[in-house]
Amino acid sequence: MKSYEVNFDGLVGPTHNYGGLSYGNVASQSNSQQASNPREAARQGLAKMKALADMGFKQGVLAPQERPDVAALRRLGFSGSDAEVIQRAAKEAMPLLVASCSASSMWVANAATVSPSADTADGRVHFTAANLNCKYHRSIEHPTTSRVLAAMFSNEQHFAHHPALPAVAQFGDEGAANHTRFCRSYGEAGVEFFVYGRSAFDSRYPAPQKYPARQTLEASQAVARLHGLSDDGVVYAQQNPSVIDQGVFHNDVISVGNGEVLFYHEDAFLETDAVLGQLQAKLASKGGNFQAIRVPRAAVAVEDAVRSYLFNSQLLSRDDGSMLLVVPEECRNNERVWAYLQQLTSQGGAVKEVKVFDLKQSMQNGGGPACLRLRVALKESELAAVNPGVIMTAPLYDTLLQWVDKHYRDRLGEADLADPQLLVECRTALDELTQILKLGSVYPFQRQP
């Protein structure tokens, strides 16, 4: 039976704005309070989805969240009608309103961790929604994320869903942004690679000094247990604390893996040789031939990697066995990074081609191509069990473009978030979207009695 890696990209929500909410994310903080263009952001994301689908890659869509999150504001003590809640928050605590309007759920690499059926004890695909405990504006996402994933992957014969881990710092979990998987082919047992920033309970592990380590070892271990992964199919690695302090807030900002290949920066991990040795040995035991592509700091400094998002790229397997690297426009605009990529593709190695996309609206908020997608490896029978409404096709692309143009504003500043009409616009748009994607009632406003 054939197997595929399906990329489910986050559809940018209608409240996309530059709130500067993500401490430790250089782009997010440096572009704080600029005016955004939600319509352009959504169109840029859809263009990437459509282009990759047209190239033969399996592509799906993950719906955005309901924002502003009025229920979250009510939990913080704001009362009255929905409009009054928004206006009170704007008057008394604007940062809380900005957080409740964040469209950060577009970065679905943080939505969940996914283990394919070939790796799990019960032979089902397992999903654990990420608690995103480190940032308030993201910590409110997981209940809706869980409902959306359950609506997309509803067949219990094939799919198992786990709630987010306890929402405390010791189990800080950022999902697939700190997880990748190596395998000979997508349908065969592979090696799942969990990268953490610190240990919650063992003080012997080093930790960053400037920016927070968002993922704990204990969270990664808990997800592996929930998914029924065997020890011979798991490798844990600690991210280098010094690169976290340079703005590498997730591992997908400093490395990317796919198939048998890990593309990583020289400074990405602690004890790199031991980590690579484990990956090589465990993948070999499953019939695979692990390949590591190391990018030396002399060629690309960590600062350049963070500014260009070289590693926040998609490494995609083509039918001929070669790989395509999908990068943001910022890589082409960085002389050192672009020179390295030209050298990489001319060497005759696994990466044969680089494809560039304009994702400026997302990039200015600190999210590149890899942030925008959640990878799910599926056998043919499992893919057939996925809700067909979320699989990208030419008609769906056209429908979603029309939907975006109908409902999204082309300019959004901080003051606009206080407009109660924005809430009405967003709910109207999302109500229509759930019909387009055949999701049912996944949003809080649709579930109110």
From Swiss-Prot:
<comment type="subunit">
    <text>Homodimer.</text>
</comment>
<comment type="function">
    <text>Catalyzes the hydrolysis of N(2)-succinylarginine into N(2)-succinylornithine, ammonia and CO(2).</text>
</comment>
<feature type="binding site">
    <location>
        <begin position="19"/>
        <end position="28"/>
    </location>
    <ligand>
        <name>substrate</name>
    </ligand>
</feature>
<dbReference type="GO" id="GO:0019545">
    <property type="term" value="P:arginine catabolic process to succinate"/>
</dbReference>
<feature type="active site" description="Nucleophile">
    <location>
        <position position="371"/>
    </location>
</feature>
<comment type="similarity">
    <text>Belongs to the succinylarginine dihydrolase family.</text>
</comment>
<dbReference type="Pfam" id="PF04996">
    <property type="entry name" value="AstB"/>
</dbReference>
<feature type="compositionally biased region" description="Low complexity">
    <location>
        <begin position="27"/>
        <end position="37"/>
    </location>
</feature>
<keyword id="KW-0056">Arginine metabolism</keyword>
<feature type="binding site">
    <location>
        <position position="365"/>
    </location>
    <ligand>
        <name>substrate</name>
    </ligand>
</feature>
<comment type="pathway">
    <text>Amino-acid degradation; L-arginine degradation via AST pathway; L-glutamate and succinate from L-arginine: step 2/5.</text>
</comment>
<dbReference type="InterPro" id="IPR007079">
    <property type="entry name" value="SuccinylArg_d-Hdrlase_AstB"/>
</dbReference>
<feature type="binding site">
    <location>
        <begin position="137"/>
        <end position="138"/>
    </location>
    <ligand>
        <name>substrate</name>
    </ligand>
</feature>
<feature type="binding site">
    <location>
        <position position="110"/>
    </location>
    <ligand>
        <name>substrate</name>
    </ligand>
</feature>
<feature type="binding site">
    <location>
        <position position="252"/>
    </location>
    <ligand>
        <name>substrate</name>
    </ligand>
</feature>
<feature type="active site">
    <location>
        <position position="250"/>
    </location>
</feature>
<dbReference type="GO" id="GO:0009015">
    <property type="term" value="F:N-succinylarginine dihydrolase activity"/>
</dbReference>
<feature type="active site">
    <location>
        <position position="174"/>
    </location>
</feature>
<feature type="binding site">
    <location>
        <position position="214"/>
    </location>
    <ligand>
        <name>substrate</name>
    </ligand>
</feature>
<keyword id="KW-0378">Hydrolase</keyword>
<dbReference type="InterPro" id="IPR037031">
    <property type="entry name" value="AstB_sf"/>
</dbReference>
<dbReference type="GO" id="GO:0019544">
    <property type="term" value="P:arginine catabolic process to glutamate"/>
</dbReference>
<protein>
    <recommendedName>
        <fullName>N-succinylarginine dihydrolase</fullName>
        <ecNumber>3.5.3.23</ecNumber>
    </recommendedName>
</protein>
<feature type="region of interest" description="Disordered">
    <location>
        <begin position="23"/>
        <end position="42"/>
    </location>
</feature>
